[in-house]
Curated annotation (Swiss-Prot):
The lineage of its organism: Bacteria, Bacillati, Cyanobacteriota, Cyanophyceae, Nostocales. PROSITE patterns: COMPLEX1_49K. The gene is ndhH. The keyword Cytoplasm does not apply. Its EC number is 7.1.1.-. This is NAD(P)H-quinone oxidoreductase subunit H.
Length: 394
């Protein structure tokens, strides 16, 4: 009987590019030896739209509507860093009320970001049901955004240099508190459904491990860094907005595997609810309806007309010029450190606008993590990183 020849040379496999609703248009050229991954080469750039060059040909006021398209799961963070950089460079003060409103919006976006990570990650592992569950909670956040900003997922166009576009509408604070009270038991439900599922644990526990030293050396940030034993959160480190006014904890793990990254994100959603509740309770001037009543009763000399309570703040003019100088501003987005390196030259347009997205840096470690793993682990490890290709490619 003739012996059947078997292939012994490595096989090259193309994965992607996929639809943007999953992990985005990312192509992986994977070299396989049987089921084992020998090498992986990510190919990026399919969603490049020249966002940095567009910024250098727009005023800050004109550019804010564009930025939701970097990371289309975290539009508020993009807007926050877009206005924080010129504010920092020009020394523009932000009223306390506007700062609290910003914090509320950012933490709602963190929850929405983690939910949109949670669903596809579970789908990658093989659990389809939670993928549909998470849209229920995201829809509630969309409704809150729509009431406050006029738009749902992206293009909120709410942040302004010096404040926010408008105050929170009548009844918004109560609706937001209702969502917070509803959401905490839902996170418990997710954990009960998923966390201790034996199939889920076997798929992600001990997979894609990153040591503390590797996480630092690769320049990782966000849950990727904190899951590897580095207690680093820019909300605590940089003291931006009003985060120092609230009592909350940085969530971190030491295992550095996919399970640790999952755990950090699930806990962060609870912390975000804690921050939102405190921000609403301490909102300078109280809910919009109370603030208006206090102003009316006290008249023009009311303290409620003071800078701290102005809901829109000292918004700059459309011809606002960025002074000469350079600055690096950063915020802790749902994926990690989102930064802007800005050079101003006393012009309405920035001379240089460099975007430092978190997921672009976090994605660099993917080939290192995949070598020696099985084919089935590729989507699990990629899913645990949490990438949005609009942000990676810019």
């Amino acid at each position: 009987m003739a012996r059947i020849e078997t292939r012994t040379e490595p096989m090259v496999l193309n994965m992607g590019p996929h639809h943007p609703s999953m992990h985005g248009v990312l192509r992986l050229i994977v070299t396989l030896d049987g089921e084992d991954v020998v090498d992986c080469e990510p190919v990026i750039g399919y969603l490049h739209r020249g966002m940095e060059k567009i910024a250098e040909n727009r005023t800050t006021v004109m550019y804010v509507p564009y930025v939701s398209r970097w990371d289309y799961a975290a539009g508020m963070f993009n807007e926050a860093v877009t206005v924080n950089a010129p504010e920092k460079l020009a020394g523009v003060a932000v009223p306390k009320r506007a700062s609290y409103i910003r914090v509320i919006m950012l933490e709602l976006n963190r929850i929405a970001n983690h939910l949109l990570w949670f669903g596809p990650f579970l789908a990658d592992v093989g659990a389809q049901t939670p993928f549909f569950y998470q849209f229920r909670e995201r829809e509630m956040i969309y409704d809150l955004w729509e009431a406050a900003t006029g738009y749902r997922m992206v293009n909120n166009n709410y942040f302004r240099v010096g404040g926010v576009a408008a105050d929170l509408p009548y009844g918004w604070v109560d609706k937001c508190l209702e969502f917070c009270d509803y959401f905490l038991p839902v996170v418990d439900e997710y954990e009960k459904l998923v966390t201790n599922n034996p199939i889920f644990r076997r798929r992600i526990e001990g997979i894609g491990t990153i040591s503390r030293e590797e996480a630092i050396n690769w320049g990782l940030s966000g849950p990727m860094l904190r899951a590897s034993g580095v207690k680093w959160d820019l909300r605590k480190v940089d003291h931006y907005e009003s985060y120092d006014d609230f009592d909350w904890d940085v969530q971190w793990e030491t295992a550095g595997d996919c399970l640790a990254r999952y755990t950090v994100r699930m806990r962060e959603m609870r912390e975000s609810v804690k921050i939102i509740k405190q921000a609403i309770k301490g909102l300078p001037g109280g809910p919009y309806e109370n603030l208006e009543a206090k102003r009316l009763i006290a008249g023009k000399k009311s303290e409620w007309d003071a800078f701290d309570y102005q809901y829109i703040g000292k918004k700059v003019s459309p011809t606002f010029k960025m002074p000469k100088g350079e600055i690096y501003a950063r915020v802790e987005s749902g994926k990690g450190e989102l930064g802007i390196y800005l050079i101003g030259d006393d012009n309405v347009f920035p001379w240089r606008w460099k975007i430092r997205p978190a997921d672009f840096n976090n994605l660099q470690i993917l080939p290192h993590l995949l070598r020696g793993m099985k084919v089935a682990d590729i989507v699990v490890i990629l899913g645990s990183i949490d990438v949005i290709m609009g942000s990676v490619d810019r």
